[in-house]
């Protein structure tokens, strides 16, 4: 909500790559809180909220990008869990050693699932399995097979993940079968807002750097003293106009972001049901 938006702007302005990590974790927390079983919430939410573990979102496959109906990853029932097999690409912070565990939310199909997006289910697949006492157990059958080469944000590891190169990665169903896309959209909607805040933070950083450069760079004469000494370029009217244009756009972005954040707060936390519904 509002606090997250303010902190998100600051984090993204200072390090947009690192901010992606907690953006995904925050979205996963909301998805698990809304749709996961009591047992899964008890096992995973505390560690995710504390930042001891981080979360990812696994949708895209080599043949399935914007058309998620083409997803081929499989989930085979086995007792109280499923065996996940498939490959996911473009997974932000899909592999790293910043935390002890990484919790993957993975879209996959069960054997009896209908075709298209109506047959997609959502599964929680931890990098390390969790023992009954909450300690970490053996490594799950999920591996990072490569890191994507990107034009920017290199400090954010964008992974290609292979699930089930061996016996199959152990995964736990979130909610009900064939409702995975519905649950994943809880996380995706959080991420969409977070990416908007990311743009705000980067824009604020760009303005601050442009302002600092305009104060430091000495070039040309002051228009009111053409025979005087050279001056910092912030003294030139057109440079000041460009800086004010940047600042006004950033302020407009900030206002929009904080209004939306306040609506998030109202939708989730207002004491009056009518107020909550009005914010949705």
Identify the role of each PLM range.
Residues 81, 85-139:
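A short core secondary-structure module
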Residues 90, 129-145, 150, 157-191, ...:
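A glycine-rich, basic-preceded beta-loop-alpha segment at the flavin cofactor/substrate interface
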Residues 3-12, 16, 23-26, 34-38, ...:
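Glycine/proline-enriched, intrinsically flexible loops and inter-domain linkers
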Residues 18, 28, 53-55, 69-73, ...:
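Structural beta-strand/beta-sheet cores of well-ordered domains, especially the beta-sheet scaffolds
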Residues 111-114, 130-133, 151-153, 183, ...:
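N-terminal functional module detector in eukaryotic proteins
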Residues 63-66, 95-97, 114, 150-157:
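Short Gly/Pro-enriched turn/cap motifs at secondary-structure boundaries
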Residues 1-23, 27, 35-36, 40, ...:
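Alpha-helical interface subdomain recognition
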């Amino acid at each position: 909500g509002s606090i997250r938006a303010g902190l998100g702007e600051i984090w993204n302005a200072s390090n947009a790559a690192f901010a992606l990590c907690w953006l995904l974790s925050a979205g996963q927390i909301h998805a698990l809180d809304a749709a996961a079983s009591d047992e899964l919430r008890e096992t995973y939410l505390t560690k995710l909220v504390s930042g001891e573990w981080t979360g990812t979102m696994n949708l895209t496959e080599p043949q399935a990008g914007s058309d998620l109906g083409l997803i081929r990853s499989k989930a085979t029932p086995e007792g109280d869990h499923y065996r996940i097999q498939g490959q996911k690409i473009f997974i932000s912070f899909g592999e790293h050693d910043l935390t002890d565990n990484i919790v993957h939310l993975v879209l996959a199909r069960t054997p009896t699932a209908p075709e298209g997006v109506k047959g997609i289910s959502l599964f929680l697949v931890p990098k390390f399995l969790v023992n009954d006492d909450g300690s970490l157990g053996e490594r799950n059958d999920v591996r990072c097979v490569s890191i994507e080469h990107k034009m920017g944000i290199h400090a954010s590891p964008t992974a290609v993940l292979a699930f089930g190169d061996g016996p199959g990665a152990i995964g736990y169903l979130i909610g009900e079968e064939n409702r995975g896309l519905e649950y994943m959209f809880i996380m995706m909607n959080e991420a969409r807002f977070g990416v908007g805040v990311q743009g705000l933070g980067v824009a604020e950083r760009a303005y601050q750097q442009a302002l600092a450069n305009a104060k430091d760079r000495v070039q040309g004469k002051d228009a009111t003293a053409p025979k005087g000494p050279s001056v910092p370029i912030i003294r030139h009217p057109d440079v000041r106009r460009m800086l004010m244009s940047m600042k006004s756009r950033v302020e407009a972005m900030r206002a929009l972001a904080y209004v939306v954040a306040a609506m998030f707060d109202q939708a989730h936390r207002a004491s009056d049901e009518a107020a909550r519904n009005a914010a949705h």
